[in-house]
Amino acid sequence: MKILRITAQGLPLFKKDLDICFYTQQRVCEEDKDSLYRLTDNYYLHSACAFIGINASGKTSVLKVISLALNIVKNEPINHVEAKSILGGTKKATIRTYFYDKRSYVCCLETVIAAKKSKTGEYVYSILSESLWEKPIATVKSKKYLTDFTGMKPVEQRNSDEAYLSDDVSFVIAHNKKANDTVEIFSLLSYTNVNVLPFTEDIPLEVIAFLDPTIEKLCFEQTEGKTFIHLKFKDEEEIILNNAADLEQYLSSGTIKGIITFSMVKEVLHSGGYLLVDEIENHFNKEIVTTLMRFFMDSRLNKNGGTLIFTTHYPELLDEYDRN
């Protein structure tokens, strides 16, 4: 499954409707094709999408909308999704997610969501209505009409028969099972200011050396239900830790965040999923950030169409993109 476009209306933090497009809308030059992912024929997707702006300009909010839309089409319960906070106390928010599925169909999922305050004062979200449109991509005459469903009737609508379905889970779950399709999401939204390395069995030595050349060994070991971390610097004795949080005493925040990020990059490039990173430059120098971007913008490495979506304060990162 590949996301083509996301639109949102009725969100408290946005005065205007939000419209985010992930496919190229203009003609693609031959030299640009290597940095894009070819969907089919002349349709290409952007593999590295950046939202650039000053503080409090809404970058993180946009990332939360994308995360919410992705989780809806992945059949995650809205009330369990971290990015649900973007809905606030909305009376009626409409999110349309346009995607391309394994059957070579372009689909549009419209999800209408409302908030209700619980006894504890927290907002609880439920889906008021849902509709799904679809059309074979072969019937689309040009890019202009790729996500245009004007005049078409939905192929499915949410109804009361779906009593077995939780009221915060999208009915697109049936479509996904039928098409044997899903979307893989890796999010670093919660790692913006928290850097605790989660358990991982495979940290490539090349990645560790790139982030900190003084590290000779870093690996996790699980024995009898306990986790041990082996850390060794060059020309020094090995250190054994039993708590990942203790790594902060020995490794910089940039190294920890780098290991987390590059481990996820490996998964995303393999699965063709989505990696969301807020404030990508946090603890990273420009060289590391541009290396990350180039992983996704190299069609030889990114054969499955993995997508990096990130926010940043640094406009100089735009130099990595070809602009009109």
Segments and roles (model prediction):
Residues 1, 15, 103-107, 119-125:
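Coil-to-beta-strand transition motifs
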Residues 1-4, 207-213, 230-238:
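N-terminal accessory segments
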Residues 1-70, 238-324:
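Switch/communication elements of ASCE P-loop NTPase nucleotide-binding domains
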Residues 8, 97-103, 131-134, 233-237:
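Short acidic, glycine-rich loop/turn motifs
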Residues 12, 88-91, 223-225:
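A short catalytic or substrate-binding loop motif that flags glycine-/basic-rich loops and adjacent residues
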Residues 44, 48-50, 54, 64-115:
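Conserved P-loop NTP-binding catalytic core
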Residues 66, 70-73, 200, 204-215, ...:
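Hydrophobic, Leu/Ile/Phe/Ala-enriched alpha-helical segments that form helix-helix packing faces
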Residues 112-224:
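Electropositive, glycine-dotted interaction segments
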